[in-house]
């Protein structure tokens, strides 16, 4: 039986908004498994949290650069937020993003790329020696469309193009570039705020859909719904899930009476051509890192080849 700590209970409460005692029971019943505890609470009708909010144990910056029909987003980690506010580190992040725009989003290719008389990897190593703290290029992603634009947005940017959360979104269209750019920035801001998991329902991981269906069906059974009705009301529940979790079906943050898909359709008149969301990437600093903060320096050192 796993030990249930106060920190685990606190985290589950922050994710789900459920009371402490229910959170402790959920963790106990599920042997400390956070995702299973979330699903257990949802089946009891106590929580609406649809997915695990990963614990963030990283510092650093997200960098975003776009140019016409392509764009990149990168994450460069440091050990402390103090370094993330350092001008040299901020310049490093912007340089890495610019290189990624030229050579693509493969981390190893970016590290091997030359800037001036040194590779990106060497430049990072030199910054480590100068600043006195480990740092690493953790990940990168890119988007490109044959016709259209890639728009970017950084939430609460500390400098132009770098902050704790960054988004790029590709709008495929033969329409007016200026109108597309304005529309793309709004959609990127929406993605930063609403955190969709996919462009539309077809892009949602089938395993996620299956788990959602199982949670909904179990919840309705516990509510005493007739078995003959469960499949129908589960499908209705899935429609709500997709409306909350997929970009085109979410209420648009700039006009919540319309979905993002409806807003795009209406914008086609201004753009002068059909508009399609070809894809998006949303990076929040440190997401997916679930180590204790005290272990993060070791992870950065290992990634940087320091140990």
Swiss-Prot record:
Entry protein name: Elongation factor Ts
Keywords: Cytoplasm, Elongation factor, Protein biosynthesis
Family to which this protein belongs: Belongs to the EF-Ts family.
Single annotated GO MF: translation elongation factor activity
Biological role stated in the UniProt entry: Associates with the EF-Tu.GDP complex and induces the exchange of GDP to GTP. It remains bound to the aminoacyl-tRNA.EF-Tu.GTP complex up to the GTP hydrolysis stage on the ribosome.
Disulfide bonds: none
Organism: Nitrobacter winogradskyi (strain ATCC 25391 / DSM 10237 / CIP 104748 / NCIMB 11846 / Nb-255)
One cellular component term from this protein's GO annotations in UniProt: cytoplasm
Stretches the record annotates as Involved in Mg(2+) ion dislocation from EF-Tu: 80-83
Location(s) in or outside the cell: Cytoplasm
Top-level lineage group: Bacteria
Main location: cytoplasm
UniProt cross-references to CDD domains, sorted A to Z: UBA_EF-Ts (cd14275)
Pfam families, per the entry: EF_TS
